[in-house]
Amino acid sequence: MSGLPVFSVLVVVLMLSAGAAALPELRRSPFPRWRLAMPPLLVAAATLVLLYLPPSNDLREPQLWTAALVAAVLGTVRGALIGLQVDQNSGRLLLWRAREGFWIAVVAALLVLGDLLAEPLGHVGASFSQAVELGLAILASFLIGRNTAIVLRSRDTPHGDL
């Protein structure tokens, strides 16, 4: 990531915020439905900032978007298979065996930190940055597909007190 330091700080803050927003999934505690939108949006925003920054500017790479599309489909399948309990009155939900949202945010943050730390230590090359960008695009797309499927399913799930 050879962009401005401001963008580097922005990307790190976005990734750490995504991890904090996904923490209720790890603790298996009920959380508001709107909170499902936060981790994918934050990870996707950080990924788009990284993809837009020079030297790579990979926004026009069809291979990247193809891999992201496949990851989104897999995320949608995963979201369809996650067990959930919904309190329709308060709009809160509880996910069963769905801790990957938090861990995806952690892995994405580690990828960004690895990219940030690898650059000053030596010339790693553009292939490492491209691998990080591809990994982030895959993780963000998976999370977007997963959480979109959960939100859509939660609207039709019968009421359960939480």
Q: Model regions: which residues?
A:
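N-terminal signal-anchor transmembrane alpha-helix
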Residues: M1-L59
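Cytoplasmic-side transmembrane-helix entry/capping segments in multi-pass membrane proteins
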Residues: P30-A44, Q63-L69, R92-F102
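Helical transmembrane-bundle signal
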Residues: M15-A18, A46-T47, A105-A109, D115, ...
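Helix-rich interaction surfaces within compact, conserved domain-sized segments
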Residues: E119-L162
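C-terminal ends of transmembrane helices
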Residues: S17-R33, G79-L93, N147-T157
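Helix-adjacent hinge/juxtasegments
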Residues: S56-Q88
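Structural signature of hydrophobic alpha-helical transmembrane segments
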Residues: S2-L16, Q63-G75, S129-A137
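Hydrophobic alpha-helical transmembrane segments in multi-pass integral membrane proteins
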Residues: L48-L59, A105-G122
